[in-house]
Amino acid sequence: MKHLAAIIAFICWQSCQGLDLRPYNVTALGMFISNDLNQDGFFTLDEMHSSFSVYDSDHDGRVTRHEYTSYVNLHTPTLHDLSHALYDDYDMDHDHHLDEHDFQNLFNIMDTDKDHRVSALEWEQYWVNQFVKYEHLHGHGHAGG
């Protein structure tokens, strides 16, 4: 299993199909399965760190916009605009770097029941909302669930 890189691979496959991420809940579930590295049914903060480490090309513990979007564009150029929008969401303190503070904040948003782990349902809810929010960057103007 390859953390968020698997997301990109999955979305890349979707892009060959016209980049229709619908049904969003199915896309989100595929992403969850790929990111639940130990397959225990929960996504943890440690798994988030592992997921984002693939983008950290200089291995300094922070992910710049350039690192993130370059990785996405290399693997899935059709997601260029979406990658910038997601980076803006992830960079919670707007300091142009994704670091521990941003990872913790993003994790807390996803962990709606505050049990220090993200269930498949919490993951699905987060990503379906993201896909709908940014549908104009990847979809065909029709919300799906």
What are these regions (language model features)?
Residues T27-L37, D46-S57, S83-H94, E100, ...:
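Primarily EF-hand calcium-binding motifs
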Residues G41-L45, G61-R65, H96-E100, H116-A120:
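Glycine-aliphatic tripeptides that mark coil-to-beta-strand junctions in extracellular
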Residues K2-G18:
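Cleavable N-terminal signal peptides of Sec/SRP-targeted secreted and luminal proteins
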Residues H3-A6, S57-R62:
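Short, charge-rich, low-complexity alpha-helical interaction segments
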Residues C16-V26:
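Cleaved targeting-peptide boundary
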Residues G61, H66-A85, H94:
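General zinc-binding finger modules coordinated by cysteine/histidine
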Residues C16, F131-G145:
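C-terminal helix/juxtamembrane-tail motif
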Residues F107-H136:
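Terminal recognition/anchoring or ligand-binding modules at protein termini
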